[in-house]
Amino acid sequence: MKKLLLCALLGIMSLSTTAKAPKVLTGIDMLERQNFKPLQGKRIGLITNPTGVNRYLKSTIDILHDAPNVQLVALYGPEHGVRGDIYAGAKVQDQKDEKTGLPIFSLYGKTRKATKEMLRGIDALVYDIQDIGSRSFTFISTMGLAMEAAAENGIELIVLDRPNPLGGLHVEGNVVEDDCVSFVSQFRIPYIYGLTCGELAKMLNAERMLANGVQCKLTVIKMKGWKRKMTFADTGLPWIASSPHIPQALTAWYYPTTGIVGELGYLSIGVGYTLPFQLFAASWIDAEELANAMIAQQMPGVTFRPIHLRPFYSTGKGEQLQGIQIHITNYKTVQLTPIQFVLMQEIARLYPEHSVMEHANQQRFSMFDKVCGSKQIRQRFMRRNQWSDIETYWNKDVKPFKILSKKYYLYR
């Protein structure tokens, strides 16, 4: 009997260990397996933040700093900083890293592209940041500008690849138009682009999407085990908050459902509450009424429930609000970005005296347009507050982009 119990216990322990082992090895994991061969003999600058960790949660900064055959000489901080303690939009200052003593150069302060002085003595830049798969999240812009700086200064850029938490099959939104190019829409890609950062880097380089068509010497350290159909949960990897308001991998799915409208600052989208990007709320909304209206739209892969809340900060701080919480029910069929436009449509119908576009601060329209990647979206929507008026325009580039981007797939 004791032997049977012991065997059962060992079996359970074995299953538990197996369940915890990640199915995917990221670029830094693979670089370690290669004994850092691509970095040998080079003076390295590292662009990273707290998401740059291996499968054991050891920081890429510490890994490269401690590796006997790697010469790490500088760090570069994107939005939120190398250690992740800077609020969204706040400038990052040049400083010294307390743990390693290495200089940290800001890529979100006076300049967003590394200068010649910042790159002096660097042979290769290494990029290791977990992105969230939406164009307006600025880390891919930092990567692209780093590619430009590398090209202009004759140095190599090495991307340590990581999963796209939205998978590799989702594509939504029009590509960025010339008058809306900005740090939140740096390249002519859709809002949801369905590529890993390594794949995106290859496409930006080969298709000459960087400024002035420059191309850099690019190396991508591929992952092992990642599939396009995977959600982040499928990878078995731990999630590190990619910004203060993306605390969980699941939040990456909700960011594109509310983030565009959130730029107007008119509705609470859960930032400042415990559900960032997962809701819409205001003091004048009837939660039951709006939830029923949104459910009646029968949008695929998503449903809604009434919610009552009092945000701790940001839009609606301290006010008693009502609204809807978004619940994604099918990650394969859901269309994420239309949710916010249908929401604005229903608000205009139910509460015309509070219709979003007519009552939001017009000074914020410019950022809304930049995040959309086109002024046409706002201008067409404002005519009747109908999603159907912009649906074709919003989706016009999806099929061509899917065809183009497939050329740069590193994973199936």
Model-derived features with residue positions:
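Bacterial Sec-dependent N-terminal signal peptides
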Residues: 1-22
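Conserved anion/nucleotide-ligand pocket segment
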Residues: 180-256
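Glycine-rich, charge-decorated loop segments at or immediately adjacent to ligand/cofactor-binding or catalytic sites
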Residues: 84-88, 158-180
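Glycine-rich oxoanion-binding loops at beta->alpha junctions
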Residues: 92-122, 134
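Short internal beta-strands
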Residues: 71-79, 160
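Glycine/threonine-rich flexible loop motifs
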Residues: 131-143
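Glycine-rich, aromatic-lined ligand/substrate-binding cores of catalytic
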Residues: 226-311
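Conserved functional hotspot residues or short segments at active or partner-binding sites
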Residues: 281-392
